[in-house]
Amino acid sequence: MVKSTSKDAQDLFHSLHSAYTATPTNLKIIDLYVCFAVFTALIQVAYMALVGSFPFNSFLSGVLSCIGTAVLAVCLRIQVNKENKEFKDLAPERAFADFVLCNLVLHLVIINFLG
């Protein structure tokens, strides 16, 4: 059995970093948006754990809004990525329009859930 060393881990992180630096800027912006949405959901969960979740519908709506938006942004990233062969025929404008429309539907459902 081969033991992994810290050099292997450093090589892995170096190769991941060098591959990510080659990523186009528009995909990096989408990645930043996804990280922000997930971070916001984590802040809401931490707040709920510390303070409580008295209006549970509000807490649930906020977390589901953040996670749903992050999932839709990941779908946008998949569709906009030029190296993805499944969506070669899809224009980036169409993918962004789908993202906006799905976000609108998501937030209408969340507002309806709030009551």
UniProtKB/Swiss-Prot annotation:
Q: Which InterPro entries does this UniProt record tie to the protein? A: DAD/Ost2
One GO BP annotation here? protein glycosylation
Q: Which residues lie on this side of the membrane: Cytoplasmic?
A: 1-31, 77-94
* Membrane topology label: Multi-pass membrane protein
Cite the Pfam families for this sequence. Answer: DAD (PF02109)
Transmembrane stretches, start-end: 32-52, 56-76, 95-115
Pathway annotation from the record: Protein modification; protein glycosylation
Q: Where in the cell is it found?
A: Endoplasmic reticulum membrane
Is the Ribosomal protein keyword given for this protein? no
User: Keywords assigned by UniProt?
Assistant: Apoptosis, Endoplasmic reticulum, Membrane, Transmembrane, Transmembrane helix
Principal location listed in the UniProt entry = endoplasmic reticulum
**Any one GO CC term of the record:** oligosaccharyltransferase complex
Note the coiled coil stretches, chain numbering. none
Lumenal side residue ranges read 53-55
Keyword Membrane in record: yes
Summary of subunit composition and partner proteins? Component of the oligosaccharyltransferase (OST) complex.
Stated role = Subunit of the oligosaccharyl transferase (OST) complex that catalyzes the initial transfer of a defined glycan (Glc(3)Man(9)GlcNAc(2) in eukaryotes) from the lipid carrier dolichol-pyrophosphate to an asparagine residue within an Asn-X-Ser/Thr consensus motif in nascent polypeptide chains, the first step in protein N-glycosylation. N-glycosylation occurs cotranslationally and the complex associates with the Sec61 complex at the channel-forming translocon complex that mediates protein translocation across the endoplasmic reticulum (ER). All subunits are required for a maximal enzyme activity.
Q: Which family does it belong to?
A: Belongs to the DAD/OST2 family.
Q: What is this protein called?
A: Dolichyl-diphosphooligosaccharide--protein glycosyltransferase subunit DAD2
Q: What is the originating organism of this protein?
A: Arabidopsis thaliana (Mouse-ear cress)
What does UniProt list as this organism's lineage? Eukaryota, Viridiplantae, Streptophyta, Embryophyta, Tracheophyta
Q: Gene symbol?
A: DAD2
